[in-house]
Each structure stands twice: as C-alpha cells, then as structure tokens.
Amino acid sequence: MQGDPMPDQILQFTHPPVPRQPPVKPSSPLTWPDDALNRPFLKERLDEFQRWLADAFDAGETAEILVDARTLYIDQLLRQLWHYHGLAHAPHTALVAVGGYGRGELHPLSDIDVLVLSQAPLTPPQQQHISELLTLLWDLKLEVGHSVRSIAECLEEGRADLTVATNLIESRLICGDLALFLTLQKQVFSDDFWPSRAFFPAKLAEQQERHSRYHGTSYNLEPDIKSSPGGLRDIHTLLWVAHRHFGATSMDEMVGFGFITRAERDELNECQSFLWRTRFALHLVLNRYDNRLLFDRQQNVAQLLRYQGEGNLPVERMMKDFFRVTRRVSELNQMLLQLFDEAILALAPDEKPQPLDDEFQLRGNLIDLRDETLFSRQPEAILLLFWQMVRNRHIEGIYSATLRQLRYARRHLKAPLCTSPEARTLFMRILHQPGAVKHALLPMHRHSVLWAYMPQWSNIVGQMQFDLFHAYTVDEHTIRVLLKLESFADESQRPYHPLCVELFPRLSQRHLLLVAALFHDIAKGRGGDHSQLGARDVLEFAALHDLPAEDAQLVAWLVESHLVMSVTAQRRDIQEPDVLVQFAGEMQSESRLHYLLCLTVADICATNETLWNSWKQSLLRELFFATEKQLRRGIHVSPDVRERVRHNRRQSLVLLRMEGIDEQRLQEIWSRCRADYFLRHTPNQLAWHARHMVLHDHDEPLVLISPQATRGGTEIFIHNQDRPYLFAAVTGELDRRNLSVHDAQIFTNRDGMAMDTFVVLEPDGSPLSPDRHPVIRQALLQILLPGDYRHPRVRRPSSKLRHFNVDTSVVFLPSPTERRSYLELTALDQPGLLARVSEVFVDLGISLHGARISTIGERVEDLFILADGDRRALSRAMQAEVRRRLTEALNPNDKV
C-alpha cells in the first residue's frame, strides 16, 4: 500500500531557485526631477522596473518582497505625479489606494485602484489636473481604476454596494489630507456602516456565489488563481471579515485575537506564498491582466517556477502543488469562517448541544466532539465521526472546534488509519450505507481523511493530466464518479440515465461498485497500465479488509476492465459477430455486465461535463442489449448474420407495405444492395431510405437528413453515383460547417451507386439544429454535382490545440474476417482530418466501408474499416504503406 503518509504535507515538487546575484534595483520615483517627468522618460522607467521585477524573481527573490516593492514603487510614482500636477496643495483632498492596491498586493499586472477623496466638489482646475494625471497613467499602460467621491458619497455608495464597502475597509492613504482620510476611516468602521452582523453573512453569500461559478471546486484544470475555490479570494475573505470585526489587518493580529492558532497562521502564510508566487509568475508571462492558469500558460509558468521533469511532468507537478494548496485553503476557510460565525452570530443561550451518543453531539446541524481529546487518544474514532454523518442525514457539516481537532489528529498520525481493525470495520460499514458517498466519502475527501485512511489515495490528490479531455484532477474525478453512481439510486435521474437507474438498485453488492470506483484510477500518474496496477492495489485492499474471494475478484475485474465497455462501444465494430462474442466473453455474466455498465456511464459523466451525450448513451445501450442477448444465447455461439439480414428486410417491408410502397420498384433497388447494407441498418432506417429512393430519380443525388434524432445524433443519408474522394468531399464539407461526424457506414451497390450514412452532432454534442437542415442539405447536394475533386476548405484550428502534441499512431487490429481490415488511428484533432485520411485511402486504391469517430479532448481515436480493390483485407505491405502515408499526412514531423 504505497503512498505519501503525510496527509498534511502541502507542497511536494517545488524546487528552490539557484541563488545568484540579484539585479540592481531601479531608482525611486521620488528621486526623479520634475523636468524629467515626461511620458517617454516615465515609460522607460516603468519598463525598466518591470524588467527588474522579472530578473529579481528569476534570481530567487520572493513574491512577497517583489509585490511590496511594486506597491511602494507605484505609491512613490503617484505621490510624485500628484505633486507634479499641482494637487499636493489642494485643500481637503487625498489620494487613497483601495482594493488590492489598498492591501498592498500589486503583482506585475495588477490593477491600480485609487479613490480621489475630496471634502468639497472639485474645482474645474482640480478636475483638469486629475484628468491629466489619469490620462498620463493610462498612456503609460497602467491599468488604473479611479473614482472621485466625498466622504458622504463613499458611505452612500458603500452601503449600496458590498464591493465598494470592502474596498473602503482596506483603503490606505497614499498622499494628501490625513485628517480627511482618518475621518473616512472612522465612518467606515462605525457600527452603522456594514456592522459585522451584516457584513459577515454578505461576504459569505458572495463567496458561495463565486464558488458556484466554478462548480464548487478548485479542481478545474484551468483554474483562476484568485477566484477559484481555495484561491486568493478565499484568503481575502478571511482577512476582510477579521478586519471588519476585530480590526485585525494581518494574520499575526488574528493570532493575537485568539481566532487562529500559530500553526494555522503558518499554514495560511505558506499557502498564500505559493499562490502569490504562482500568480507573480503568471503575470510575468502575460501582456494583459489575467489570473487564469490556462493550458497555453501552464508550461511557461512551470518553467519560471523551476519545476523539473520530462514532457508534461513539470506542468503536472506544478498543478499538483496548486491543487493541494487550494484544498488546504478551502478547509481553513471553512473552519475559520465558521469560527467567525460563532463569534459574530452566536447561538442563543438556550440552543444547547444535543447528544448523539457517548462521543458526539449536535450543535445546530453540525457534529461536535463531546471530548476534544478523543481523536488524539483513539485515531480510529475519526471514522466514527463519518459513520455518524452517514447515519444522521440532517448533519450538514463538522463543528469548527471538532474540525480543528481532526486536523490536529490527522497531522500527528503515526500510521495510516486502515492499519486499525476498528477503522477498517467502520469504513466497510460506511460503504454499505445508502448515501455513503455524499454524507461520508465526500467530506472524508474534503478533509483529507481518505488520504489518511488509504495511502494509495495520496498519489492522486491534485493529480492532473495535461490534456483537453479530463476536466478535473484524478481525485476529484473519482469522487464525481462515486457521486454519479450514488445518483443512480435516485428516481429523478431516470430521464437522464434510464438504464442505470433501472439496474443500480438491483445490484446485490453496491458497496463493491463503490470500492471499484475508488480504485479505478488510483494508479494514474505512476507509469504503466493504470488499470492493471489499480487491480493489484484493490486486491491488497480486499485482503486487508477481509473481503470474500469472489468479491475481491469482482472489484479487481471491474478496475482492470473499467475502460473495456467504453472502448468497445465507441471504437469497435460491434456489428461484427466476433467482436460481440469477444466482448461477451470478457463479461462472462449478465451480473458483471450490469456492474460494468453503471461504472462506465459514471466514469464518462465524471470525466468532463460535455462528454456525455445521447450519442454515447445510444452506443452503450446498443452494446449492452446486444451483449445481454449474446450471453443468454451462449457466450461462444455466434449470431446468425443471415437471419439478421432476413429479419431486417422483412420488418422494413412490413412498414413500407403499410404505406403502399411500390414493391416492384423497391425490389429493384434492394436487389442491387449488398447484405452488409441490411445488416448494419435497422428496419426503420431501411424503410426511411427506401420510401425516398423509390420516388427519386436514380441518376440524381439524394440527400436525406433525419427529422428526429437517430441513435443520439442526426443521420444523413446520401445516395449518389460513387466516385473517388466522395467520402473526403462529404466529411470535409460537414467539418467546414462545424459538424462532428461520429459514425459512417459506406456502401457501394452492385450498380456502382454509393449509399452512405453519417451520424453527425453539433459541437455541443446535440443533434443537428432543425433550422440548419436546409442549408446543410443544399451544401451537400452542391458538392455531389459532377466535377473534379477539390480539397475542402478547412476551419481555423482551435487556439488551444496549438499547445498539445499527440503522436500519430496507426495500428491494424486483429481482423475477424479475411474481407476487411480494421485500422485504429490516434492523432491530434485538426480540421479536415477525415478528408485528409480519406484522400490517402483513395490514392492507395483502398475502399472505406465504415468509420467510428471518437474525439477525446485534443486527440482523435478513430476506427476505419477497409478493403483493397479486390474487396479483401489489406496485405502487410499495404498496411505499412498506409501507416507511412497517414503519418506524413497528419503530422509531417512524425517518422514511422
């Protein structure tokens, strides 16, 4: 059971800078003569100072020192310019720093927010001087925000706007009338201007609203250093509330008031220092103010922060540290705001704690220790806390004093909690309870108890993957998988996941599915096959927790096979009998199939919110029901393909006879179709095609677009004289229209007519918008007109794709038939890819019979069904040539 035994270690991978001689600091603005204060001189001095900030940071200076230096530099610049523009002697006027500038937090690109405070309305000359000053600052490319107000106006605006009130609370005098500024301060901190009982709940609501914009987690892989949960704003919120209630202006003063311990202060300081350093580095690589760690910035920031490793490892290590820091800030923020709540909005005296048992009591809806030494004396009692939470659903959280004791006990653990037999018993009892994830595992994760319980968990805490596919860190993704599984017990989810809601309550060992979910990605980031490594880990867990051998085999199989169903449904040809037989053989039983379907759906939904759509749902349903039939028929009994062809024709004919179809004309058309056409379409699809082909001029191109969603997407059917590059032309046009092709069935009749079917989706994964049908149909008819093939115009690639590299891989899968070859292509997603691939096939005389298209973030993983000119599988020599040509076409820098 390998892992980091220190759940309270924050930073793991940071490397100290190589010490070197710091650069010489530029001169103070206060030393500049008045006759030099022109725009070119000032621009040169500011550029010089920005270069010094970057050089000093590179030399190892701390962000704290440099942020203070920029704040002081801007203070001195504004004082000098205030004097230069004749404002120093303006009566009863002051220049005040507000917002982040008021706090003294000026990073390289931070806004400079100032208040011009005046007792009386400004005179026209004063207005002119201030306008000239601001214009100069803007010309110098400084991001200056300003307001001009009297004390009365400040108070009026502040009472109406919480943000203005907060800015006033942390205001700081730069220059001007001190007495006027102190009068403002006295008013701002009076009891009738945002008293603590109003200010605290307002700031709490503001934080909750901000968190909701980030889906309540800091684990989005492109986080905002300032505003994401656990970011700098959460630290600011603590400081604002402490400042307003206690007058504390620093963490040291908060210790003095007894509201945080020295250890908590040190932890907050360490977290803030890391966030400041990361934000400082981000500002150095940008030209415009922004606090988002977007993918295209992460590599440069990691390099500035001196993270080491090959490939994407520096980014992954930096982000792992980042997510561990934000996790710690979130926990401290929750605990300390609750302490403020108790101090500011104290419980009424008659609201006494209500005993739960000998160890715990309720304070309102929060669980609290009756003996604060319990966790230190008996660490396994930490699990007892979460056992109570899952049994008493009305408990909404942990009381601050108990959370403080939990943090202390967690920090002083001598061994993982799972080494305690009592803790193991409690953990398994928790997993058996309804609501175990929401009421126990989720808070256990939030408070690092999962880490303290099972060492393997530490490896994935904050573990990201540098791609566009995974939206969350591995630990956050795993928790979301668990939550999604638990949601399948909720009848309200039936419209979204009807099959899973039907199956999940019938699973006899639902707790084993939770164990499998906990371990399905536990080995990510270790190297090697994470499914196999995770299966070994879960077997160790099963042995330690005395699971029966049959249960251990099930969870190990689920972990090792957790990707099999998704891959088979999306990237294999399940119409081929051998593919279905092989998949059914891997399932072995309907019970295992049911478990795996629930895990697969939860895994897809929890990977990326945009990933699950009706198309994927239809693929999994199709595979699920086909496999159920196969298991009932006998694992190794191949489906009767000829009977399926006859069945589809018969059922389609029944539908068409009800409409009075011209059967003679229909049989003429069907007689030219090959068996595969009837095998790979449903009776409804066959009838839809036929009713239009019977009435259509055989020599004219036919384009049909399904009015309703088909298999979760929009089906486009094309009947036209076959010709080279037809597939390339169609897919190129669809791509240019920003439609994604997810499936293609390509047939050429005995008379040389193409009958091609495409399933397409809009960029958001929805079926084609009905108002686009006429435009798309007309565009396709246009490209079907006779004429030479022209390379389709392609869309501009996404800017995000420029920052990713995917090695082109061409693999020929084992073929169940001598008539087809199955090519699996992995490459960087790019506009016009399908057209480019198709052109290679045409140039080599290869016919394309089908395609299954899967886009996973920045990479495509596509399956192509091919045959040579003699309608047979490709020779080894031809496979090698295809591999070479595709690699050249998709990535000229790759070598075979």
UniProtKB/Swiss-Prot annotation:
Keyword Cell membrane part of the UniProt annotation: no
GO BP term, example: regulation of nitrogen utilization
Alphabetized PANTHER family for the sequence: BIFUNCTIONAL URIDYLYLTRANSFERASE/URIDYLYL-REMOVING ENZYME, BIFUNCTIONAL URIDYLYLTRANSFERASE_URIDYLYL-REMOVING ENZYME
GO molecular function: [protein-PII] uridylyltransferase activity; phosphoric diester hydrolase activity
Classification lineage: Bacteria, Pseudomonadati, Pseudomonadota, Gammaproteobacteria, Enterobacterales
Catalysed reaction, written as an equation: [protein-PII]-L-tyrosine + UTP = [protein-PII]-uridylyl-L-tyrosine + diphosphate; [protein-PII]-uridylyl-L-tyrosine + H2O = [protein-PII]-L-tyrosine + UMP + H(+)
InterPro entries tied to this protein: ACT-like_dom_sf, ACT_dom, HD/PDEase_dom, HD_domain, NT_sf, PII_UdlTrfase/GS_AdlTrfase, Polymerase_NTP_transf_dom, UTase/UR
Required cofactor names: Mg(2+)
Keywords from the named record: Hydrolase, Magnesium, Multifunctional enzyme, Nucleotidyltransferase, Repeat, Transferase
Membrane-crossing residue ranges in chain numbering: none
Biased segments, Pro residues type: 16-26
Family: Belongs to the GlnD family.
Activity control: Uridylyltransferase (UTase) activity is inhibited by glutamine, while glutamine activates uridylyl-removing (UR) activity.
Domain annotation HD: ranges: 474-596
One Pfam family matching this protein: GlnD_UR_UTase
Species this protein is from: Sodalis glossinidius (strain morsitans)
Protein's UniProt name: Bifunctional uridylyltransferase/uridylyl-removing enzyme
Primary role: Modifies, by uridylylation and deuridylylation, the PII regulatory proteins (GlnB and homologs), in response to the nitrogen status of the cell that GlnD senses through the glutamine level. Under low glutamine levels, catalyzes the conversion of the PII proteins and UTP to PII-UMP and PPi, while under higher glutamine levels, GlnD hydrolyzes PII-UMP to PII and UMP (deuridylylation). Thus, controls uridylylation state and activity of the PII proteins, and plays an important role in the regulation of nitrogen assimilation and metabolism.
